């Protein structure tokens, strides 16, 4: 069982594209650039025989082989490749909900664990207000230096959110963290939620 699903419509669309390449044995390679970061991009590329990497996982499909990049594989859990037709023709879509989620464990560096909780627990809640928070640094005394953006920048409730929501969550999950500090310029209020 693969972590990625390629729908029948996507399979047929890709098989048609591959058949036009006039390269026997051509397949596709699925990978993520900058996985586990906010800049993650999920990609599908043609993969001629011999272009696959030895560590790639080969996923044999009805008409071709999809090679899954080994480093990207965990980030492709629950990913779906689909093809939807519309009046203009159609569009291939790749939904990879875990592409931007860092993979961490208890032994991961503090900054990686902070980013993980910001991405998975904190920012989804802030997104409902058009906001987000980013880790700038972890200073020597165990303080996470954070910066708000979007609807949180200039928001009158940012301090409450910082202390009651973000700090409480991070301190519960990362015992060696001692606190958080906000370095956002809250005088910029044009996008503020409150």
Swiss-Prot record:
Keywords: 4Fe-4S, Iron, Iron-sulfur, Metal-binding
InterPro entries: Fe/S_biogenesis_protein_NfuA, FeS_biogenesis, FSCA_dom_sf, HesB-like_dom_sf, NIF_FeS_clus_asmbl_NifU_C
Cofactor field: [4Fe-4S] cluster
Gene3D superfamilies, sorted: Fe-S cluster assembly (FSCA), HesB-like domain
GO BP of this protein: iron-sulfur cluster assembly; protein maturation
4Fe-4S listed as a keyword: yes
Highest taxon above the source species: Bacteria
Textual note on the cofactor: Binds 1 [4Fe-4S] cluster per subunit. The cluster is presumably bound at the interface of two monomers.
Pfam families membership: Fe-S_biosyn, NifU
Regions that span the bilayer: none
Binding site for [4Fe-4S] cluster: 152, 155
Keyword Iron: yes
A molecular function (GO) term: 4 iron, 4 sulfur cluster binding
NCBIfam families with a match to the protein in the record: YhgI_GntY (TIGR03341)
Family per similarity comment: Belongs to the NfuA family.
Assembly description: Homodimer.
Purpose: Involved in iron-sulfur cluster biogenesis. Binds a 4Fe-4S cluster, can transfer this cluster to apoproteins, and thereby intervenes in the maturation of Fe/S proteins. Could also act as a scaffold/chaperone for damaged Fe/S proteins.
Identification of the protein by name: Fe/S biogenesis protein NfuA
Primary gene name: nfuA
